[in-house]
Amino acid sequence: MNLRKASSLLTFMGFLWGAWGQSIATPLPSATESKLRTPVVGDADSVYHKHETLVNVQFSQVQLSQWAAGGQSSASLIAKVDQFWEYDGMDFGWDTEFHGAFGLLHRPDDQVILKTDDRIELATKLGRRLKDKGSLTALGSFRTQLAPGYATVNGMPDVNQVTSRLMAPGYLVLALGLDMKPTESTTIFVAPFTSKSTFVLDDSLSAQGLFGVLPGERARHEVGGYIRVGLKEQVTENVTYAARLDLFSNYLEEPEAIDIFTDHVLTLKVNSWLSTTLGLTLIYDKDVELVLREPDPDIPGDPGDVGPGVQLKQILAVGLSLKFS
């Protein structure tokens, strides 16, 4: 490990341990602790339960006939389910959340169906409350997709070039750290002890050594530090902003190349069943190789550029929005 890598590792570890030590040494002001994290006074057997389910269905259609300006007819559908379970007792807290999304775009003119969204994610946190100092927490997080993804050639999916599928990749994070809630709308989880596993359970994809696994291997395991920051803010009566930031640094290999996952959702509620949603997701993982530049057909033997890069997804949709609790 060269000096630059060692310096980056020490800086990241120092930040983790500094956040850990500061949170243990400095109690959270009682005025800023959330009602959820405040121990129930009186009955030692008192507990707090909360369950919430959000269902969103968004649809759009473009129909063109003899349209002089040109264009293509299309129809798209995106369905999302978000579920949250919260349990709080005097000494323990347990939070679980599930996020599922799937979207398709149909172009009838060329009989093409494209996938526009695909996400399966489950995360759970079990914490032992430390008096006035947050919670000592174990976290487990899993993320994958449902349907195969294909390479796109000239705007068309090539079904002979599968680039991803269920559990290829799949990501599992297991972490032990301190969970803090400095304000009513903010959570911070700092874990100096974290295991991150990447699974590629498709033989054809693992043989290519995709997503950081060695060619022919089906899994890759990393040890490092992990930080998760969450925010859910009621901006106005009808506008909600939710954000999440995950950071992971591999202690043993290129610790300065931090994996980033961040998700932002702005929801504008029109009425009890209609809403507009603006979503932005950004991912950076040095182990995921992307086509940064297509080969130039005018240059013989040009391989193009392949390497790590920023993955970006943006969604603007209007549709049905239902909430159950």
Task: Indicate residue ranges for each PLM-predicted region.
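Transmembrane beta-strands of outer-membrane beta-barrel proteins
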Residues: 51-55, 94-98, 136-140, 172, ...
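Transmembrane beta-strands of outer-membrane beta-barrel pores
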Residues: 57-63, 89-91, 100-106, 142-148, ...
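Outer-membrane beta-barrel translocator domains and adjoining extracellular loop/strand segments
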Residues: 64-69, 108-112, 149-156, 200-207, ...
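Outer-membrane beta-barrel "beta-signal"
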Residues: 266, 310-325
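Extracellular loop and loop/strand-boundary signature of outer-membrane beta-barrel proteins
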Residues: 65-71, 106-112, 157-164, 212-217, ...
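Outer-membrane beta-barrel channels and translocator barrels
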Residues: 86-90, 127-133, 183-185, 232-238, ...
